[in-house]
Amino acid sequence: MSLPIGQVGFIHDESKRVLRLNATNKCITRLPPATDVKDGLVWEDSVDRAHLDLRFEVLREGLPRGSEHYPGIDEDARTRFLCAYEGGRLVGCSTLQTDERGGCRFRIRGMAVSPNFRNRGIGSRIVKRLQQYASEQGTGIWCNARIRAVPMYKRCGFVEVSDVFEIEGIGLHYDMEWK
């Protein structure tokens, strides 16, 4: 039960659980039965190095290494992580933080899609799955959306609820909500 060394991917074990293996065939995530792997989207129970590397590459340009980690949030048992895979490679990630505000229980953070995989609907698929989860919980979602991501969030039904503002070292954002 392994993959070729150097390839990240998924296999099923004898109990029908999905295992995500890293490049050395070490099991890094045990997921519920395969029904949780859908359209290349996988709920993760924690962030791993690939997740942090993608966050850093896409979201933390010019900032020091380590800024891609969200202390206290990444370790919070209530935090959910949704990742997108294509060909066994992590190409998109998001963090769904429990951070209640005005009718929204959840906040999207760390939403990133690999530059080589943009404009393929991966970000929208991630957001729609997060919305499905929030809807099942009877709540909405809020986020601080980068200017370049606002059109995607609007297509997914989010609305701007603030004027544009700057997060130092990161760039211009809008506060957005989906209820």
Task: For every predicted segment, state its role.
Residues 21-87:
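Short amphipathic alpha-helix that is part of the acyltransferase structural core
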Residues 83, 89-99, 105-112:
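Conserved beta-strand in the GNAT
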Residues 142, 159-175:
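Conserved catalytic-core motifs of GNAT/GCN5-like acyltransferases
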